[in-house]
């Protein structure tokens, strides 16, 4: 593969893997919680965490020569603020109702990452 194609492959792969990390994290919380032991759930969370960090390294290796849709950036940023912000507030303020807000942020993060993967273009 040429330099351009390799950078594109690394970046797109990283974005898809990061998207899957978010999906796996949500599955761990909502799907596995009552089906596995606490120890196994912690192991699952460790796997998700490492997957996310490694996907970021792939993205970092590839992004230096690409432009991405600004919409993707704003989706990811707003999703992160809504998702993490609602969970932090849920924990700190003990407001259970905020748990229903988190999936909106998760959906925005997933949409932003997929839009990033689709909209990548080489810099001029």
What do these predicted ranges mean?
Residues 2-124:
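Polytopic transmembrane helical bundles with strong interfacial aromatic enrichment
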């Amino acid at each position: 593969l040429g330099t351009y194609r390799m950078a594109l492959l690394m970046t797109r792969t990283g974005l898809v893997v990061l998207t899957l990390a978010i999906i796996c994290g949500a599955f761990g919380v909502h799907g596995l919680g009552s089906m596995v032991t606490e120890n196994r759930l912690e192991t699952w969370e460790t796997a998700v965490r490492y997957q996310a960090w490694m996907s970021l390294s792939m993205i970092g290796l590839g992004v230096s020569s690409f432009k991405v849709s600004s919409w993707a950036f704003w989706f990811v940023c707003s999703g992160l603020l809504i998702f993490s912000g609602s969970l932090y507030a849920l924990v700190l303020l003990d407001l259970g109702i905020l748990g229903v807000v988190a999936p909106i942020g998760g959906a925005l993060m997933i949409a932003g990452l997929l839009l990033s993967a689709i909209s990548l273009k080489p810099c001029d």
